[in-house]
Amino acid sequence: MAAVLANGDSQGRPQRNYQVVVAGTRDMGIGKDGVLPWKLPGDLKFFKELTLTTSDPVKKNAVIMGRKTWESIPVKSRPLPGRLNVILTRSGSFDFATVENVVICGSMESALELLASTPYCLSIEKVFVIGGGQVLREYLKGPACEAIHLTDIQSSIECDTFIPPVDFSVFQPWYSSFPVIESNIRHSFVSFVRVRKSVAETHESNGKESTEVDTKNDKFETENFSFLPKMVYDRHEEYQYLNLVEDIIRSGAQKNDRTGTGTLSKFGCQMRFNLRKNFPLLTTKRVFWRGVVEELLWFISGSTNAKVLQEKGIHIWDGNASREYLNSVGLAHREEGDLGPIYGFQWRHFGAEYTDMHADYTGKGFDQLMDVIDKIKNDPEDRRIILSAWNPSDLKKMALPPCHMFAQFYVENGELSCQMYQRSADMGLGVPFNIASYSLLTYMIAQVCDLSPGDFVHVIGDAHVYRNHVRALEEQIQKMPKPFPILKINPSKKDIDSFMASDFKLVGYDPHQKIEMKMAV
């Protein structure tokens, strides 16, 4: 393709949207003395794959850059192969006459107009803006910028060129890789998507409890995020859940179960969620966030009284706390609502003799949760930082033996990670709750211990779909994920027993509608 010169005149013609690709430090330093102040082969590989790959094999992508960025590319590597190189310059002396796959434009507006016109609108799949500093400072927040792909440099590196930070009122993380260290530089790859056209109203609670999502402020103006490159779009962590559900429905073993409902089942599954940039609350259906928070606080309090949750409008334990159910499992002597020595009791009073939900167990048994926190603070390399709800001697006293039964915590690089083992996992109703609950617990313990949240690893024994959930889940897996929300916690809370529901605030949760599924009891 011969080079073309487009002037800077704008006639209000249609323009292409674009996505920014940039590597930057925590204060958004992107260069020093006109070059990248780091050498990261992994970053170059990511850049090449992102900007070169197309879904349509007959199309190519375009990369837009300023003249200085073009000149900073080694001569042997320019133009960037397999891509249309669009160079922004007003210099009349710029020599382009013999360069193939290069277009010269006098402004960003003229470049975007040119790419929206024939033949480029038919041959160019995606448009990436790749630098330099002046271009990015002006167009990182431009209304046509639909995504930002950031190599997040987490090591301290001196820079003299900076760009504005990502505007979190407009953009939210879609995907964040787990951190890697290369050339002694810690970094990760983060893709942000535009969810609003302009700065949203401030996320105030307007008198609501913070655990209530403010749907007015959190409503996305963007509903479909398929504009992302497929390699990024498919990395949304919710696909771990959706793909597992689909696999179980398609090829799971047919099993009977204690409820008589019947399941499709797989054994030995794992999902891993990155807690550093956002919070894994599923978006392909609305998850009962207030219920997640109140139940976890109830566990932490050591309570076994389902009526405490009922009084807050949380009815997730009603089925296992009813008179009829307690009678059916040999607990007819137990008061209705008394669930026995379940999760919270084992977390805070392991080994104590359980009498009923009204007894005062202060100082009785072993407080596993406080032991976990003490070890994280004082012996973070301990490999025995364990929280277990599985107490064989108490199982027959429980209304329901623990499903999520065992958690191990791990400290590295100032971050706290959690791996939870779940013996039995109801993929439709339970697992979305469980992912959120243990991720929240990790956030809380991390804050108490002056750490940052790292990973949540979810290991499942019997992962099953109840037969009466199949149709609802088939509907759910057809939905397209949206960005996970961001969780903010009252930073003044440093005692695990001091948290209240109002200390937690979700920002940017705009899921698909609720999908009804009946609980098997």
Curated annotation (Swiss-Prot):
Catalytic activity of the protein: (6S)-5,6,7,8-tetrahydrofolate + NADP(+) = 7,8-dihydrofolate + NADPH + H(+); dUMP + (6R)-5,10-methylene-5,6,7,8-tetrahydrofolate = 7,8-dihydrofolate + dTMP
CDD domains, alphabetized: DHFR (cd00209), TS_Pyrimidine_HMase (cd00351)
UniProt binding sites for dUMP: 258, 404, 422-426, 434, 464-466
This protein's record includes keyword Hydrolase: no
GO cellular component term, pick one: cytosol
Region described as Thymidylate synthase: 197-521
Gene3D superfamilies: Dihydrofolate Reductase, subunit A, Thymidylate synthase/dCMP hydroxymethylase domain
Matches recorded under SUPFAM superfamilies: Dihydrofolate reductase-like, Thymidylate synthase/dCMP hydroxymethylase
UniProt GO molecular function: dihydrofolate reductase activity; thymidylate synthase activity
GO biological process, one term: dTMP biosynthetic process
Pfam families: DHFR_1, Thymidylat_synt
Catalytic residues of the enzyme: 403
EC number: 1.5.1.3, 2.1.1.45
Binding site for NADP(+): 23, 29-35, 67-69, 88-91, 131-138
Pathway(s) where this gene product acts: Cofactor biosynthesis; tetrahydrofolate biosynthesis; 5,6,7,8-tetrahydrofolate from 7,8-dihydrofolate: step 1/1
Keywords carried by this UniProt record: Methyltransferase, Multifunctional enzyme, NADP, Nucleotide biosynthesis, One-carbon metabolism, Oxidoreductase, Transferase
Residue ranges constituting the DHFR domain according to the UniProt record: 17-194
InterPro entries: DHFR-like_dom_sf, DHFR-TS, DHFR_CS, DHFR_dom, Thymidate_synth/dCMP_Mease, Thymidate_synth/dCMP_Mease_dom, Thymidate_synth/dCMP_Mease_sf, Thymidylate_synthase
Function statement: Bifunctional enzyme. Involved in de novo dTMP biosynthesis. Key enzyme in folate metabolism. Can play two different roles depending on the source of dihydrofolate: de novo synthesis of tetrahydrofolate or recycling of the dihydrofolate released as one of the end products of the TS catalyzed reaction. Catalyzes an essential reaction for de novo glycine and purine synthesis, DNA precursor synthesis, and for the conversion of dUMP to dTMP.
Family recorded in the similarity comment: In the N-terminal section; belongs to the dihydrofolate reductase family. In the C-terminal section; belongs to the thymidylate synthase family.
PANTHER family cross-referenced by the UniProt entry: THYMIDYLATE SYNTHASE, THYMIDYLATE SYNTHASE 1
Name under which the protein is recorded: Bifunctional dihydrofolate reductase-thymidylate synthase
Species per Swiss-Prot/TrEMBL record: Zea mays
Biological classification of the source: Eukaryota, Viridiplantae, Streptophyta, Embryophyta, Tracheophyta
